[in-house]
Amino acid sequence: MKRTLVRPFITSAAMLLLAACSATGGPSAGEGVMVRQITQSAYCGLTGPGVAFVRSEADREALLDVCGQNMATDVVRKVDLSREALVMVTLGQKPTAGYSVGLQSALAQGESLVLDMRVNEPAPDMMVAQVITSPCAVLAVEPRGWQQIRVQGLTEQPLVRTLEN
C-alpha cells in the first residue's frame, strides 16, 4: 500500500520541479541584484518623494547632515562605500505619523536598478499624532556601474534617477 502512494507522489514532485525549472520570465524580467535595507526612519528631513545615490563619503555625510533627520546614522556610516553604494528612497512629507517605506524587491534590467518599494500608511480610522513626518529607507546596493535607478511604488509613476559616471 505504501509503494502505491509513494510512486505517484515522486512522479508529481518531479513534474512540478521540471515545470518550475523550465519557466522563464517575460519581456520585462530582470536578474536578481544584491540589495539590503540597512535602516528606515519616519524623520529623514527630506520634503519630496525622491531617490539619492551615494558613492562617496562626502555625499554620505551631506545626506546624513540634513536638518530634521532622526535615523540610525551609525549603521549608514558602517557601510563600506568601496564595496557597496547607498540609495536613499524618500516618501516626502506626510501630515501624520504612521507612514513608512521599505524595500519589497530589487532587480537589474540592463544598466538600470529597479527598486520596488512598499509604502505603509495609517488606516483611515487609526489615531495618529498630527506631526509632519518624512519617511525614508536607506539601502546598500552592489555597485555595477548603474546608469539609472527606477523606484516603483512611491508615486503613481516610477521615479527615475539618471546617474552620472
Model-predicted regions and their roles:
Residues 1-19:
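Sec-dependent bacterial lipoprotein signal peptides
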